[in-house]
Amino acid sequence: MAKYTIVDKDTCIACGACGAAAPDIYDYDDEGIAFVTLDENKGVVEVPEVLEEDMIDAFEGCPTDSIKVADEPFEGDPLKFE
């Protein structure tokens, strides 16, 4: 089943946990705030199946619950959480 991810940049504390768990999915802006590299944090590009386990590790390891994961794209409402 398809999975999508987005980072709530308002609650991200720039701890680096998501990039450590899933460096092929998450990166950081100039202030250290995480974003999804697959689609510039829009949550509309399906996470490749081979990266889903890393995405879940990042999701579960985020201390502020800023990593969001959904079965559908976040289109229209970028902070629609599952």
Swiss-Prot record:
Residues noted as binding [4Fe-4S] cluster in the record, renumbered to the chain: C12, C15, C18, C62
InterPro entries per record: 3Fe4S_ferredoxin, 4Fe4S_Fe-S-bd, ET_Ferredoxin
Tagged with keyword Transmembrane: no
Cofactor note: Binds 1 [4Fe-4S] cluster.
ATP-binding found in the keyword field: no
Lineage top rank: taxon: Bacteria
Cofactors named for this entry: [4Fe-4S] cluster
GO MF term (any one): iron ion binding
Keyword annotations from UniProtKB, A to Z: 4Fe-4S, Electron transport, Iron, Iron-sulfur, Metal-binding, Repeat, Transport
SUPFAM superfamilies cross-referenced by the UniProt entry: 4Fe-4S ferredoxins
4Fe-4S ferredoxin-type domain sequence ranges: 3-31
Function: Ferredoxins are iron-sulfur proteins that transfer electrons in a wide variety of metabolic reactions. This ferredoxin may act as a phosphodonor to cytochrome P450 BioI.
Name of the protein in its database record: Ferredoxin
This protein's encoding gene: fer
